[in-house]
Amino acid sequence: MNSYALDLADVLVEAGAIRFGEFRLSSGSTSPIYIDMRIVPSKPQLFRRVLGMLAEKLNDVREVDVVVGVATAGIIWATGLALLSEKPLAYVRPKRKEHGLQRVVEGIVEGRRVLVVDDVATTGSSLASAVESLREAGAEPVAAMVIVDREQGAVERLADYGVKLYSLATLREIIHAMVVKGYLDPAEATRLINLLYGESL
């Protein structure tokens, strides 16, 4: 079993960052489960714990020069990862500013290999948009990293751009880890997996 998934199960439960019900995602689809990574930085010890996992996972990624956060949720994770890895930081806005220098990409990225960071990947549309903006700014996006991959097309979408997506765990792995840890009843986990992916645990 993915050790990151086991650790994340503890973090998500302790932080109150995993919720069950009916939620509309940024992709427009609905989901019976929601991962709210935005709340984790409010718990410094848990925040540090997840950042440590990301820093360790960075060892799997080919050499990168700059860590780039996707606004807004990805910026705080990219900032922590940049500090731990002692790499420069930049970030990508969802749209161009209408004042000041009117930039989409903030930070020095031209001619540099960059890692794009976000909290959760669903379809990968936000990450793909960031990759496009970074290329327009003269950067070379070589990889992307998220804490949780919901397995709804992000890996494939980024592969179309020649960018590999790394994640600490998939949502499926986290659900399984929650069963192993005793946080979730196996029958409920099977129901969730069936709703999400049309299959059993």
Swiss-Prot record:
Enzyme class: transferase
Binding locations of orotate: 122, 150
Pfam families, per the entry: Pribosyltran
Enzyme Commission number: 2.4.2.10
Catalytic activity: orotidine 5'-phosphate + diphosphate = orotate + 5-phospho-alpha-D-ribose 1-diphosphate
Needed cofactors: Mg(2+)
Domain of life: Archaea
Gene3D superfamilies: 3.40.50.2020
Gene Ontology biological-process entries: 'de novo' UMP biosynthetic process; pyrimidine nucleobase biosynthetic process
InterPro entries membership: OPRT, Or_phspho_trans_dom, PRibTrfase_dom, PRTase-like
Pathway stated in the Swiss-Prot or TrEMBL entry: Pyrimidine metabolism; UMP biosynthesis via de novo pathway; UMP from orotate: step 1/2
GO molecular function annotation: magnesium ion binding; orotate phosphoribosyltransferase activity
Binding annotation for 5-phospho-alpha-D-ribose 1-diphosphate: 93, 97, 99, 118-126
Keywords in alphabetical order: Glycosyltransferase, Magnesium, Pyrimidine biosynthesis, Transferase
PANTHER family, sorted: OROTATE PHOSPHORIBOSYLTRANSFERASE (PTHR19278), URIDINE 5'-MONOPHOSPHATE SYNTHASE (PTHR19278:SF9)
Assembly mode: Homodimer.
HAMAP family reported for this sequence: PyrE
Free-text function comment from the UniProt entry: Catalyzes the transfer of a ribosyl phosphate group from 5-phosphoribose 1-diphosphate to orotate, leading to the formation of orotidine monophosphate (OMP).
Family: Belongs to the purine/pyrimidine phosphoribosyltransferase family. PyrE subfamily.
Protein name, UniProt field: Orotate phosphoribosyltransferase
Lineage: Archaea, Thermoproteota, Thermoprotei, Desulfurococcales, Pyrodictiaceae
UniProt gene name: pyrE
